[in-house]
């Protein structure tokens, strides 16, 4: 009995040893096909097939193991089956694109598609041994680019550029006396009726439209009041009402002169937008504005003697208060004579025009010359008697 067991053990060890001693001889070769992967394990066999990938290698002895995709042994579609006969010389593993998580990777340089997977070759179907191998099987399918070119030489005349640039209108702002045709006003009294006029001149008629907006009045020291908003609508009817547009490139409105307390100069700052007139329109669109409200009245009255203000054609502002009761009717304004217009005496300063300043300079120069001549004459008169007295003594 013991003899039989010993013989059986020797036969079993020889069988196991034969499985373990089997190994792959040389380097496997890989061929890529069209539709699927197929991994063939041959024993000294060279075969040809129409497969995506075909791996061929030689083993020392007959192959009784199996081949499978790594990490997919439990999937029947991802492994080969062990041969049940001793006469089997090979085993095959057939894989399609959508099975066993075959990796697909696009390449841009070179352009194409990589298909790759890991195949484990086990010589024993039950366990792995040191003779087993893992192969990374990879196929590259290159994209072919064929560029078909045909040169056609066409001679065309160069395009002729016809361009014409319209000159933009030249705009100006004026403060006139009483009406759109009145003379310019540079010095005015509070309550005087003036006409604010914006005009633009252009060589091309019926081409442009204008919009006066964003108007401010400034005292020169940062105190600003807004008269027109960005749409061209008035904000205070006692300062300036909504503008009239008699023509496409003219806007204006009459208003009474007002001033800041303790300030003699006022600076007006407005923006004028020029747009191209729409074809077919007889008139330009003008802003549709509601009646402007009245601002809150100030508690500070201007000084009684500060009744003359200078107007400058500049443009900018912030909120200030004007008292409508301080506006003087136009009929009550008294015309100034020549001396009042050119020599305006005030408490804190002397304001004169260029003519008055010139006359004052000439007058001072004349008085200086008269004084100098008088001094020289007096000095000469006092020296003459002394000279005569000296001559008589010498005699």
From Swiss-Prot:
Glycosylation sites: 90, 307
The keyword Transmembrane helix appears for this protein: yes
Record-linked SMART domains: ZP
GO MF terms, alphabetically ordered: structural constituent of cuticle
Protein's membrane topology: Single-pass type I membrane protein
InterPro entries in UniProt: CUT_N, Cuticlin, ZP_dom
Pfam family, one: CUT_N
Domain ZP: 46-291
Signal peptide positions on this chain: 1-18
Keyword Transmembrane attached: yes
Topological domains, Cytoplasmic: 380-395
Record protein name field: Cuticlin-5
Gene disruption: observed consequences: RNAi-mediated knockdown results in disrupted alae formation in L1 and dauer stage larvae with alae often present on only one side of the larvae.
Record lineage: Eukaryota, Metazoa, Ecdysozoa, Nematoda, Chromadorea
Subcellular location: Cell membrane
Residues that span the membrane, as ranges: 359-379
GO cellular component, one term: plasma membrane
Organism in which the protein naturally occurs: Caenorhabditis elegans
Topological region Extracellular: 19-358
Domain of life of the native organism: Eukaryota
Entry keyword set: Cell membrane, Cuticle, Glycoprotein, Membrane, Signal, Transmembrane, Transmembrane helix
Role, per record: Plays a role in alae formation in L1 and dauer stage larvae.
